[in-house]
C-alpha cells in the first residue's frame, strides 16, 4: 500500500500535457488584445459547431478555422482537438516551428491563421449570442 501511495505521489508531480485548444487560446492572446473568451458564442461559427452563413468578417475567421480543422482531421492519425504543436510567440507575431510532423504543422497553421484573423477583424458586440435559428440561415 505504501508503494502505491508513493508511486501516486510521484505521478501527481507530472504536469499534464497541454491540449491543442489551450495552445490556440494562447495564440489568440498573442496575436491580439482580446481574450479567447471574447469569441465564445460570437456569430454563427465561433465556439462549438456552426451553421449557415457567417455574419461578418470575424465569424468568417471562425468558419475558416472550423474548415481547416476538418481538413486536418483527414490527415491519417491527426486529431486537431488534441494534437499539440510547437510555436513561438513574439507578440503579436506567431511562428509555427514544426517541420517534420505534418499534422502538427497543419494544425498550427490553422490556429495561427485564425488568431491573426481574429486580431484584425472588427468585433461587433451585437453578434454575440445571436439566435442561430434566425441569424444563421
Swiss-Prot record:
SMART domains: PA2c. Binds 1 Ca(2+) ion per subunit. GO terms for cellular component: extracellular region. Disulfide bonds join 30-89, 44-136, 46-62, 61-117, 68-110, 78-103, 96-108. GO terms for biological process: arachidonate secretion; lipid catabolic process; phospholipid metabolic process. The keyword Nucleotidyltransferase does not apply. Ca(2+) binds at residues 45, 47, 49, 66. It comes from the Eukaryota. PANTHER family: PHOSPHOLIPASE A2, PHOSPHOLIPASE A2 FAMILY MEMBER. Homodimer; non-covalently linked. Snake venom phospholipase A2 (PLA2) that shows anticoagulant and neurotoxic activities. PLA2 catalyzes the calcium-dependent hydrolysis of the 2-acyl groups in 3-sn-phosphoglycerides. This is Basic phospholipase A2 2. The lineage of its organism: Eukaryota, Metazoa, Chordata, Craniata, Vertebrata.
